[in-house]
Amino acid sequence: MMMARKQDVRIPTYNISVVGLSGTEKEKGQCGIGKSCLCNRFVRPSADEFHLDHTSVLSTSDFGGRVVNNDHFLYWGEVSRSLEDCVECKMHIVEQTEFIDDQTFQPHRSTALQPYIKRAAATKLASAEKLMYFCTDQLGLEQDFEQKQMPDGKLLVDGFLLGIDVSRGMNRNFDDQLKFVSNLYNQLAKTKKPIVVVLTKCDEGVERYIRDAHTFALSKKNLQVVETSARSNVNVDLAFSTLVQLIDKSRGKTKIIPYFEALKQQSQQIATAKDKYEWLVSRIVKNHNENWLSVSRKMQASPEYQDYVYLEGTQKAKKLFLQHIHRLKHEHIERRRKLYLAALPLAFEALIPNLDEIDHLSCIKAKKLLETKPEFLKWFVVLEETPWDATSHIDNMENERIPFDLMDTVPAEQLYEAHLEKLRNERKRVEMRRAFKENLETSPFITPGKPWEEARSFIMNEDFYQWLEESVYMDIYGKHQKQIIDKAKEEFQELLLEYSELFYELELDAKPSKEKMGVIQDVLGEEQRFKALQKLQAERDALILKHIHFVYHPTKETCPSCPACVDAKIEHLISSRFIRPSDRNQKNSLSDPNIDRINLVILGKDGLARELANEIRALCTNDDKYVIDGKMYELSLRPIEGNVRLPVNSFQTPTFQPHGCLCLYNSKESLSYVVESIEKSRESTLGRRDNHLVHLPLTLILVNKRGDTSGETLHSLIQQGQQIASKLQCVFLDPASAGIGYGRNINEKQISQVLKGLLDSKRNLNLVSSTASIKDLADVDLRIVMCLMCGDPFSADDILFPVLQSQTCKSSHCGSNNSVLLELPIGLHKKRIELSVLSYHSSFSIRKSRLVHGYIVFYSAKRKASLAMLRAFLCEVQDIIPIQLVALTDGAVDVLDNDLSREQLTEGEEIAQEIDGRFTSIPCSQPQHKLEIFHPFFKDVVEKKNIIEATHMYDNAAEACSTTEEVFNSPRAGSPLCNSNLQDSEEDIEPSYSLFREDTSLPSLSKDHSKLSMELEGNDGLSFIMSNFESKLNNKVPPPVKPKPPVHFEITKGDLSYLDQGHRDGQRKSVSSSPWLPQDGFDPSDYAEPMDAVVKPRNEEENIYSVPHDSTQGKIITIRNINKAQSNGSGNGSDSEMDTSSLERGRKVSIVSKPVLYRTRCTRLGRFASYRTSFSVGSDDELGPIRKKEEDQASQGYKGDNAVIPYETDEDPRRRNILRSLRRNTKKPKPKPRPSITKATWESNYFGVPLTTVVTPEKPIPIFIERCIEYIEATGLSTEGIYRVSGNKSEMESLQRQFDQDHNLDLAEKDFTVNTVAGAMKSFFSELPDPLVPYNMQIDLVEAHKINDREQKLHALKEVLKKFPKENHEVFKYVISHLNKVSHNNKVNLMTSENLSICFWPTLMRPDFSTMDALTATRTYQTIIELFIQQCPFFFYNRPITEPPGARPSSPSAVASTVPFLTSTPVTSQPSPPQSPPPTPQSPMQPLLPSQLQAEHTL
């Protein structure tokens, strides 16, 4: 090295010797360790100059040549490199090896006879005229390579590179190699020269070998290891530069890079160079006919070409060029192929357009046919060489004709087949349209309501699918869906009718509870007709609700068979049978005068009623006509200001039956008068059969002449009025606002609102004729009802023909259109029979309200629903009333062939046998039956006439004496059908007498009233009236009875003590104190006398009532209740809890059991009877919590009709479990308008008051709502199920109470849960007197929602939104903006806009479920609220309409455009009220992207 520095001071020169395992195949294996490749890559790194094969087996001549020069080392030449410190140096590279004789396979003899280990460690090398080594091919051809001699023929070695092969070498043991290397290292170490271990062939390295090599190096002092790969050119330069740093201590230490990291860098460098080279080739080479020589010359000077050739070599560069040429040629051929294939259909259309010519030809035969066509050469060219894409034809751009050999390819065959299909499609389009329709009709997968997207998958593989366009599919499918949906709905309606017993047993009302709806779905769930509407659940639920509405409120209009309802047919038949020209005018004058007439009671003291009546009359025309919706109505007003117990102030008179009542007040005293008058009016009719005053529509109005809407007094009156309206279940109207006019009590808009409500109630009434009193029996002897099923496959004309054509048939005196009079000989005398022909649904209500001596019930033998309705009807009929069953068949042949007809005939006969009724069948083919077939039945009726009449009279008396809340709540007792539209009977218009005896030992009503008067003078008078009113509704109140001859009862002290005890127990017992005075022409001996006036404990055998057995002889039959349990659930008026003593104790009596219902006598009736007592009758809002009973209490039974029916032993366990889980107290709770947490504990001045009282123009948002939403957005946006999961009721009540006391309540400090706050917020809206979305706006919203076009629909909804009252609009905007924000976090809280709308629409809209429109529009309401939440920016912030659900903005700008609507506020001169909940730092605004998550509907 010192000599090198003397020669060149500037550029240092280092001599490096590369050593490692060498020798024969025995020592080193079949290949070397890679010393030559390492030297080759370092000295000549270009890929073209790198050689993998360097042999050590040489001939004697090669060994003696100038390159080897009889030495066992190779001189690789001189290399100049710039090291890391940018200092250039020169290196002479020498490889120490051992050459093998190719003859003896022993090492060649050399001048140095030392072993390899010692020879490799030599530091002085000398060989005169030794040439630089390139590769094996150089040996023997030295003149063909550059000849460069080793400098001065000698070198002094400055350092050693010790190579270790870490690959899996063939026939080489790595451990032996390590031993060799260890010995070699020890020898090299003696020279004191730097040594670096080089691991070669790391690209094929074995992990263990590499680890062992590092272990070996660590065992030596300061021995560095470099992992290399000469083939991949990884770390080769690093190995030599590391050794140079060790040689020259003054140079910086080289960082040794691990192999895989260096390999990654090298691979990235090669990949970058390749990409640049490919780009260069694609830019230069555009034609697939280019060659490598010309292109390589063009790229010679390009750095991209040079870099890639340097790294990968010329051969790889050429390979990439050829790949590019091949790709260009392929693309060119494909372009030509596409042109030819595109022209091929045109050639087919021109040459073979006739389907008949080619219909059955294959492509091969069609090819021959093409050659015969005259214009063949115009479209095709026949090439001498094939295939066409391998010939020069591909470059013949001028000839666009199709190569004929293209017809042999698969795409050409497919085009030919497509041409055939096209021709066939044109021929068979009409046929396939019909085939598609038939396929839809026969496919079992096409079910009602299945969307087209789902149905398409079932017909995709059908042959005819390709023959129809999408629009044709959808048109056919839409029509087919309409047909099958209509059919499925009809079948489902028939299913509901087949389960008539279930619906009547459940005693459903206008708002069925969730439990009852669950039972209905559970019972019907397994029916195929129920499952058929699985995809139309909304429509199915609407049908169920519609059917429930029909069951609860049966009219001709709600009848499922409308307009073919039996009632309409019967009315038409009877009216056309008896109408006469001379009677037309009379008939018109006798028609119902109330059709276009409104009778309105106005109740208000101190002149309020009279003043309002005058104001309303001032708005009417001269003849008291009022215009509503363009139609003229006669308005009859009855102002009442005094004591309603007096006849002059009675709500109803013989000529006036009210349709509604306006209740006016302007002070606490006038409000107390209203409550007391309503109480008295209802109380006076509790015992009547036409107690419709109990359900009279009421409207409570606060009169405020001055229009002053401020002040504590007014707010207090409003709040009290709302509470009273809630208790009375009536409408409360806000006081008339200022600007109406001086002196006005109510504006015209409010009057129209009230009258419209009355019209709606009036239209829903289908009043059955009032019950005939006993005195009317002088007109007719028997009253028979004939029941027909609507929709049965027979004609009512044929059934009634024998009746109407009978000579004895006459028009009914009562003028009814559904009854006739018959005079028939029964026994020895003629009897006058009133025959009423009604549908079953009209007959249900008269089973209890009308005196009926017998029923003739028809049913169709081939219709299940017909017999099911008959069973449901008979369940509630008393077993003393004779029944005639009539089965209608299609003839004897049909009965034999039809299993259903045979089964239903058999069941009808069995029912008749079990109830001791009569049965007959009439073929519909021979409907001209004779009335004589009913004569045995008429005889049965005559025999039981007396006991039926006595039973009817007793039931009315017993019902009056045991009236409970059921009178008010039962859908049967309270149904409009049970009321009368005719004038009251004389007994009904008599003034009410004292209900209790004026006896000091008995509770006195007069005392109650005196107490009431004293309490009214105090501040709590109103609350006392309401509590008194509720208590009277919840206790038994006897009816007023008429005077009767004095009858003295012996009431012992024990009796009175029992009564006192009962009074202390809270049971109100009543004793009639007024004598029963007979009227003119009244014979007391003809009628049963109620005998339940004396209060006594009953024995097992008790006197119930007495029946006149023979009026001429004065004998009386006393009927006793032998088995009390038989009266359970009868609904026929519960037994009085008072024992009675007979008026005829000394007379002979006969014992008869008290009548029961047919359901108790017939096993085929009442199969769903166990459901009757499983629920508390009422709507969801009325049910309240389940009341649990003790087992022993349940075993003792329950007195009266509401006793629990025990489970049957053979009952279905699943059904029994349902009943047990849903079992409720059988006593019906008093109806409540809505559960309110404020009613139970305190009277709030904030909750449950009108919205206008809790907002101001400065603060348009209620402070409570603002606090709740701020709290929820700060802590609860990520709460799963927010608004769906209910909060704790007691905590919600506590929150509202605390806020009521302190409006500055901090929710965070109180540590309320998020669900509690959310529930309290919903409760605030639920308790508003009117919903946040006004009812009149709901109608407009529904109409706007019906618009099909989405954009037009949204604009229409926005216009309706502008009509909201200002207060409602601001709060609605605030709440919807908050819900929109909640929906943005649906991935966390799982509350999408759909889920939120399901939870909120009942709270915000509160629809009136007493109307069918509201019942069937629930899905519409929910969708409207969902749209408001989804499109909140559009509705409230003038933003564009957002994408529909499932869409996403296509760019960041699109997203941004949907985000900031909540944060942008318009610049105004005044502070604007809060428009939406402010964004919190924890929850930044997110894009308004709709979500498709689903959640269950849980309110």
Swiss-Prot record:
Residues 1471-1484 have a biased composition (Pro residues). One of its GO terms (biological process) is neuron projection guidance. N-terminal part (1-266) has GTPase activity. Required for proper cellular localization. Its main location: cytoplasm. Detected in neutrophils (at protein level). This is Rho GTPase-activating protein 35. It is found in: Cytoplasm, Cytoskeleton, Cilium basal body; Cytoplasm; Nucleus; Cell membrane. Phosphorylation of Tyr-1105 by PTK6 promotes the association with RASA1, inactivating RHOA while activating RAS. Phosphorylation at Tyr-308 by PDGFRA inhibits binding to GTF2I. Phosphorylated by PRKCA at Ser-1221 and Thr-1226, induces relocalization from the cytoplasm to regions of plasma membrane ruffling and prevents the binding and substrate specificity regulation by phospholipids. In brain, phosphorylated by FYN and SRC. During focal adhesion formation, phosphorylated by MAPK1 and MAPK3 at the C-terminal region, probably at Ser-1451, Ser-1476, Thr-1480 and Ser-1483. GO terms for cellular component: actin cytoskeleton; ciliary basal body; cytosol; nucleus; plasma membrane. One of its GO terms (molecular function) is DNA binding. Rho GTPase-activating protein (GAP). Binds several acidic phospholipids which inhibits the Rho GAP activity to promote the Rac GAP activity. This binding is inhibited by phosphorylation by PRKCA. Involved in cell differentiation as well as cell adhesion and migration, plays an important role in retinal tissue morphogenesis, neural tube fusion, midline fusion of the cerebral hemispheres and mammary gland branching morphogenesis. Transduces signals from p21-ras to the nucleus, acting via the ras GTPase-activating protein (GAP). Interacts with RASA1. Interacts with the general transcription factor GTF2I, the interaction sequesters GTF2I in the cytoplasm. It holds the Pfam family RhoGAP-FF1. SMART domains: FF, RhoGAP. PROSITE patterns: FF, PG1, PG2, RHOGAP. Binding of acidic phospholipids inhibits the Rho GAP activity and promotes the Rac GAP activity. GTP binds at residues 28, 33-37, 52, 56, 95-97, 201-203, 229-231. The modification Phosphothreonine is found at T1226, T1480. The modification Phosphoserine is found at residues 589, 770, 773, 970, 975, 985, 1001, 1072, 1134, 1142, 1150, 1176, 1179, 1221, 1236, 1472, 1476, 1483. The modification Phosphotyrosine is found at Y308, Y1087, Y1105. The gene is ARHGAP35. Residues 783-947 form the pG2 pseudoGTPase domain. Residues 592-767 form the pG1 pseudoGTPase domain. InterPro entries: FF_domain, FF_domain_sf, P-loop_NTPase, pG1, Rho-GAP_domain, Rho_GTPase_activation_prot, RhoGAP-FF1, RhoGAP_dom. The record marks R1284 as: Arginine finger. Residues 270-327, 368-422, 429-483, 485-550 form the FF domain. Residues 1058-1089, 1124-1146, 1177-1207, 1446-1499 are annotated as: Disordered.
